[in-house]
From Swiss-Prot:
Protein name: Beta-galactosidase 2
PROSITE patterns registered for this protein in UniProt: GLYCOSYL_HYDROL_F2_1, GLYCOSYL_HYDROL_F2_2
Keywords: Glycosidase, Hydrolase, Magnesium, Metal-binding, Plasmid, Sodium
Residues holding Na(+): 202, 602, 605
Cofactor details (free text): Binds 2 magnesium ions per monomer.
Active site, per annotation: 462, 538
Classification via NCBIfam families: PRK09525.1
Phylogenetic classification of the source organism: Bacteria, Pseudomonadati, Pseudomonadota, Gammaproteobacteria, Enterobacterales
Residues that bind Mg(2+) 2: 598
Keyword Magnesium tagged: yes
GO biological process: lactose catabolic process
Gene designation per UniProt: lacZ2
Species this protein is from: Klebsiella pneumoniae subsp. pneumoniae (strain ATCC 700721 / MGH 78578)
């Protein structure tokens, strides 16, 4: 029977979820993950503990629109209409309530600490039997690793406690509430709490028990906390493992702690001591603490490159050696410090190849499983990332163990963001909110500080800068001086950060915002008195078709030592799977669930799609971040290793010389490069081709053997140089038949053998081509100056909020999308060996001329059509997106073959990873399926394109797909696209960059804008 003090009515009346001074009730203190082994060998080998029991699985669930709607009887028994859900999960992914995607704007009315009366509430219940031995002695705990956003817990009708902070564990002592036989848990989860005001991250807002739930049985006298730290001499040849252990329970003289350090099966060091002993101040020391220090000779150091791990086992036992309990953790010997303006790991300056990562799954929402976590880490390592920022909250505890094992540097970030507050520091400068903020920072440190992968603490994200930040910065520095602290808020360089950590600062361009100027990263280093390293906490906003200009950042990182890299925003698109009326899955974004407010597709900024399929931009990141750099002088290749600790022991350098993609010579050389060292490779005499074409030297670094994170044959680095371009000399050929020109009132028609070309005299366009009796065009060949807008072109512009500075709004306002062609000239001439068509068009909008396009089409006796285009751009119109030609081809061929840059999509400001070669791909692979449709699939540096019976030659860029630019521009989701008749071909003489420094302001660098007044290009179109 529920006692009055345990009743739901009492809890509802108290309204703990609207009191920032109440962050928990009866919650146990934070600590590292425990297993409570009763066998030290099991602790050493990390076997599953017999004292731990998972409660994951089917729970009963009932949803209510508000906590007041929950019946009191639910505390005692399941409701008749309760459903079954899987724990962990977000209830929105089971059809209850709706997920909400918003970036800055709070999803509730801003009135802290109060939340709406309509506060969706999930009532979970579970019955279970307890091991009777657990009831006889010791303490049984329940651990909720993550509940969003706040919850009350009852056991057998009695109230146990309350917890909030959705991203850290809430742990309670159940011992007094359990009995023999069947026990019942009841968990009331509220969607909104005062804690929601501290959790305004750019992500889907979801609810429920979304991380693991487990029981843990510990002895009455137990290890209640332990943390380890490593210290070194100057040359890292000797180390000390310092282990601080705390106990709880009856303090007896015969209690001892033993700490043993293991490397595999070998015990490296061990020490035993009683509790107490260390004097803290004039009153003495802690009687329930002990600190042991173990000396280690020549430790194998931990780094992301070589993640050497030891195992520390902490045993609590009696003086006669009887084991009471053991806990354990992996240990990495490594040192992090800032010295002379540089962030150092084991004495070497780091170059952070980082990415921000949200915990997101397209089917499961914010529920992470081990398979997905490992998949993310492997992809990061395979693409030359060495660091990850837990944006913007502590991650699932398993994540850190995996980062320790595989080798990734981690920025561990507190679950604090108040981006929607005005001003942003409204709460973080308010002492009433210090307890809540303190819980989020201190508990993160207490949980995760044993992980060697965690090299930096972060105070949170986008919360302004307040006095609470300064207080928490000081607390971390006093408790854990072994790690730097970073925090971007308030200008990225406040007192509360050891690292200048701006977001979206540009390489050379200042953004002098009021109060918090965002300087260029180069300028920031040179500000008077500034000596800290600079690491961008967010940069290169990878939204849709983006990451233009990425190479510029990496040029700066390698040029200026104190520019020590950054974290790309971000890793994975946050789209969610929905199903149409036929049960077909499709990818949804903000607003697709009826969620208001929402920020549309701004949740999709990933280098990989939600299912972890890579975006093309990921290859650019991989190439720029590669650990081997190359230079070529004559026949000598200089290979420079950017590894700090790893000697190349699993790398072969493959080289190949090819002429227009045809191999002429190749070879293979083992790499033997010391950390930060160089190797010179002398190539044999290279062939000198006699035929025309481009001669390229390509090198690849291949790993012949599999590693923990890559398969055998993995390519880790590559580079390409153009050695020469031999031009052909066209000799007089045998006389060809002269094309025949026929003129009518409406058309010029040119015939040659079985081919015909038709030019409409009213439009001036090539309106049709025939090969035999087969039409080749579904639409005329026309000039094209626009593209289906990228996310970077749109910026923050939307129907209800127009940003006139966005590229798409400039193009719309100027009439680029509405421009119509006025024919100024269309003539035909028969030459000695060809027919020449000359056209001039003025592309106009509302009486204003935007572009003048002059074209000649020369069709000779070989059947080739040489197209020459000269375009003049009006001085008062915005720089165009492209200058090219477009048409709809009648044929749909299976494959596309081209000689140019590839194989992946590339753009003028994102092409350093592309290689010049002859490529052949299915037509479907020429389209990049961005969830929000846009311009996509461009291939630059093309010399030849073959598709169906057609061939184009010249120096151009192209994309080819079943979707027109018009359809891409008018369609909101990729699943709504339909394959059109034929194939759309876009051939560009020039194409604007895509940008990507951020996605809300124009970010295409000047050198990649089409700012010239006139353009000239040529194209040869023939049939094979």
């Amino acid at each position: 029977m529920t006692m009055i003090t345990d009743s739901l009515a009492v809890v509802l009346q108290r309204r703990d979820w609207e009191n920032p001074g109440v962050t928990q009730l009866n919650r146990l203190a934070a600590h590292p993950p425990f297993a409570s082994w009763r066998n030290s060998e099991e602790a050493r080998t990390d076997r599953p503990s017999q004292e731990s029991r998972s409660l994951n699985g089917e729970w009963r669930f009932a949803w209510f629109p508000a906590p007041e709607a929950v019946p009191e009887s639910w505390l005692e028994r399941d409701l008749p209409d309760a459903d079954t859900v899987i724990v962990p999960s977000n209830w929105q992914m089971h059809g209850y309530d709706a997920p909400i995607y918003t970036n800055v704007t709070y999803p509730i009315a801003v009135n802290p600490p109060y939340v709406p009366t309509e506060n969706p509430t999930g009532c979970y219940s579970l019955t279970f039997n307890i091991d009777e031995s657990w009831l006889q002695e010791g303490q049984t705990r329940i651990i909720f690793d993550g509940v969003n956003s706040a919850f009350h817990l009852w056991c057998n009708g009695r109230w146990v406690g309350y917890g909030q902070d959705s991203r850290l564990p809430s742990e309670f002592d159940l011992s007094a509430f359990l009995h023999a036989g069947e026990n019942r848990l009841a968990v009331m989860v509220l969607r909104w709490s005062d804690g929601s005001y501290l959790e305004d991250q750019d992500m889907w807002r979801m609810s429920g028990i979304f991380r693991d739930v487990s029981l843990l049985h510990k002895p009455s006298t137990q290890i209640s906390d332990f943390h380890v730290a490593t210290h070194f001499n100057d040359d890292f040849s000797r180390a000390v493992l310092e282990a601080d252990v705390q106990m709880y329970g009856e303090l007896r003289d015969e209690l001892r702690v033993t700490v043993s350090l293991w490397q595999g099966e070998t015990q490296v060091a061990s020490g035993t001591a009683p509790f107490g002993g260390e004097i803290i101040d004039e009153r003495g020391g802690y009687a329930d603490h002990v600190t042991l220090r173990l000396n280690v000779e020549n430790p194998k150091l931990w780094s992301a490159e070589i993640p050497n791990l030891y195992r520390a086992v902490v045993e609590l036992h009696t003086a006669d050696g009887t084991l009471i309990e053991a806990e354990a953790c992996d240990v990495g010997f490594r040192e992090v410090r800032i010295e002379n303006g540089l962030l150092l790991l084991n004495g070497k300056p780091l170059l952070i190849r980082g990415v921000n990562r949200h915990e997101h799954h397209p089917l499961h929402g914010q529920v992470m499983d081990e398979q997905t976590m490992v998949q993310d880490i492997l992809l990061m390592k395979q693409n030359n990332f060495n660091a990850v920022r837990c944006s913007h909250y502590p991650n699932h505890p398993l994540w850190y163990t995996l980062c320790d094992h595989y080798g990734l540097y981690v920025v561990d970030e507190a679950n604090i963001e108040t981006h929607g507050m005005v001003p942003m520091n409204r709460l973080t400068d308010d002492p009433r909110w210090l307890p809540a903020m303190s819980e989020r920072v201190t508990r993160m440190v207490q949980r995760d500080r044993n992980h060697p992968s965690v090299i930096i603490w972060s105070l949170g994200n986008e919360s302004g800068h307040g006095a609470n930040h300064d207080a928490l910065y000081r607390w971390i520095k006093s408790v854990d001086p072994s790690r730097p602290v970073q925090y971007e808020g308030g200008g990225a360089d406040t007192f509360a950060t050891d690292i200048i950590c701006p977001m979206y600062a540009r390489v050379d361009e200042d953004q002098p915002f009021p109060a918090v100027p965002k300087w260029s990263i180069k300028k920031w280093l040179s500000l008077p008195g500034e000596t800290r390293p600079l690491i961008l906490c967010e940069y290169a906003h990878a939204m849709g078709n983006s990451l233009g200009g990425f190479a510029k950042y990496w040029q700066a990182f390698r040029q200026y030592p104190r520019l020590q890299g950054g974290f790309v925003w971000d890793w994975v698109d946050q789209s969610l799977i929905k199903y149409d009326e036929n049960g077909n899955p499709w990818s949804a974004y903000g607003g697709d669930f009826g969620d208001t407010p929402n920020d549309r597709q701004f949740c999709m900024n990933g280098l990989v799609f939600a299912d972890r399929t890579p975006h093309p931009a990921l290859t650019e990141a991989k190439h720029q971040q590669q650990f081997f750099q190359f230079s070529l002088s004559g026949r000598t290749i200089e290979v420079t290793s950017e590894y700090l600790f790893r000697h190349s022991d699993n790398e072969l350098l493959h080289w190949m010389v090819a002429l227009d993609g045809k191999p002429l010579a190749s070879g293979e050389v083992p790499l033997d490069v010391a950390p930060q060292g160089k190797q010179l490779i002398e190539l044999p005499g290279l062939p000198q081709p006699k035929s025309a074409g481009q001669l390229w030297l390509t090198v690849h670094v291949v790993q012949p053997n599999a590693t923990t994170w890559s398969a055998a044959g993995h390519i880790s680095a590559w580079q390409q140089w153009r050695l020469a371009e031999n031009l052909s000399v066209t000799l007089p050929s045998a006389p060809h038949a002269i094309p025949q020109l026929t003129t009518s009132e409406t058309d010029f028609c040119i015939e040659l053998d079985n081919k015909r070309w038709q030019f409409n005299r009213q439009s001036g366009f090539l309106s049709q081509m025939w090969i035999g009796d087969k039409k080749q065009l579904l639409t005329p060949l026309r000039d094209q100056f626009t593209r289906a807008p990228l996310d970077n072109d749109i910026g923050v512009s939307e129907a209800t909020r127009i940003d006139p500075n966005a590229w798409v709004e400039r193009w719309k306002a100027a009439g680029h999308y509405q421009a119509e062609a006025a024919l100024l000239q269309c003539t035909a001439d028969t030459l000695a060996d060809a027919v020449l068509i000359t056209t001039v068009h003025a592309w106009q909008h509302q009486g204003k001329t935007l572009f003048i396009s002059r074209k000649t089409y020369r069709i000779d006796g070989s059947g080739q059509m040489a197209i020459t285009v000269d375009v003049e751009v009006a001085s008062n119109t915005p720089h165009p997106a492209r200058i090219g030609l477009t048409c709809q081809l009648a044929q749909v061929a299976e494959r596309v073959n081209w000689l140019g840059l590839g194989p992946q999509e590339n753009y003028p400001d994102r092409l350093t990873a592309a290689c010049f070669d002859r490529w052949d791909l299915p037509l479907s692979d020429m389209y990049t399926p961005y969830v929000f449709p846009s311009e996509n699939g461009l291939r630059c540096g093309t010399r030849e394109l073959n598709y169906g019976p057609h061939q184009w030659r010249g120096d151009f860029q192209f994309n080819i797909s079943r979707y027109s630019q018009q359809q891409l521009m008018e369609t909101s989701h990729r699943h709504l696209l339909h394959a059109e008749e034929g194939t759309w071909l876009n051939i560009d003489g020039f194409h604007m960059g895509i940008g990507g420094d951020d996605s809300w302001s124009p970010s295409v660098s000047a050198e990649f804008q089409l700012s010239a007044g006139s353009y000239h290009y040529q194209l040869l179109w023939c049939q094979k």
